Amino acid sequence: DSSTSRGLGDVYKRQMLDGTIPVEMQDKYLNIILFETERLNKLTKSLIDLNQFGHHGIHLDIADFDINTMIRTTILTFEGKCNEKGLSFDLLLTGKELFVRGDMVKIQQILYNLIDNAVKFSNNDSSIKIETSIRNEKVFISVKDHGIGIPKDSLSKIWERFYKSDLSRGKDKRGTGLGLSIVKEIVQAHGENINVISTEGVGTEFIFTLPLSKKEG
């Protein structure tokens, strides 16, 4: 994760210096570099938190924030990878803004990890659907890809630390196997749920919930 992001930043910087990225587009790519730098700093803290979950529980900084804006910002990070694979995002977001209650830093990490997996395991020239919806004072966030899917005998194991299925080993040799473990522990720390629906050879959908902010009431 960190080596990929640093490499992406180096590529963008070289392309800005040699003129591959035109001047009028440089602000956009500088913002991506800054976003990634900040996210990696937060990831380091998340890994420390993960190590402490079993000892002291996880500390949450709860606030109201717009999950739709967070989704739109997070997908910008994956523009380069998506262009390489011919992937597109299909956003089905409820309302222009949708406020939830949660720890912004940690929820952003959930989104990054789920979208990163979707990009990684999607078939070329396919789409990734990200959806937000409201039911019974809960906001449901879904990330769905069209790709290799997860074998049935691996579904119950994907949340374990360092677990990687045989299919993912070939696709993601550099991954830590911590991503989904972090995701589940953060969701549970919020008192919420995350589920996975997957068919091998078809694709995977992750769905997690967050409390609807009273701002939406």
Language-model-detected regions and their locations in the chain:
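Short conserved segment of the HATPase_c
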Residues: 150-164
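Conserved glycine-rich
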Residues: 191-192
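Single conserved hydrophobic/aromatic residue that forms the stacking wall/gate
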Residues: 1-12
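Conserved micro-motifs of the catalytic ATP-binding
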Residues: 21, 25, 55-60, 99-102
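Short helix-loop "hinge" at the ATP-lid/N-box region of the Bergerat-fold HATPase_c
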Residues: 118-119
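Conserved catalytic submotifs in the C-terminal HATPase_c
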Residues: 61-66, 83, 88-98
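Short alpha-helical segment of the dimerization/phosphotransfer core of two-component systems
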Residues: 35-40
